[in-house]
């Protein structure tokens, strides 16, 4: 797999980017500007109603997208956004630490000549 991923964490019930998340995205900008495709996938833990989690997952992905586009609008044609509020957890949701890891957005990107899965 040749995709690369940047993980952006979020607080419980929030789609607001933290200063650390903004810094991480800004630090990766030179690489992202060279990417052929960028997919931003918003995710949640399993607490709360499904409809809320789907909406929150989308809001997280859009927050990342909006931050990237606010400084580099030329990324627009390379970006896509998905929400995955009810699946694909990277950690068990039965612990606080696991739920914290699942509250994230993934910025998955391919460089020139590669394709996203």
Which functions belong to the PLM regions below?
Residues 1-2:
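Pro/Ala/Gly-rich low-complexity, hydrophilic intrinsically disordered segments
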Residues 44-117:
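Periplasmic OmpA-like peptidoglycan-binding domain that tethers envelope proteins to the cell wall
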Residues 9-42, 62-70, 107, 114-117:
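Periplasmic peptidoglycan-binding/anchoring modules of Gram-negative envelope and division proteins
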Residues 5, 12, 91:
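Residue-level signal for pocket-adjacent positions within structured domains
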Residues 5-7, 104:
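Short, solvent-exposed beta-strand edge segments and adjacent coil->beta transition regions
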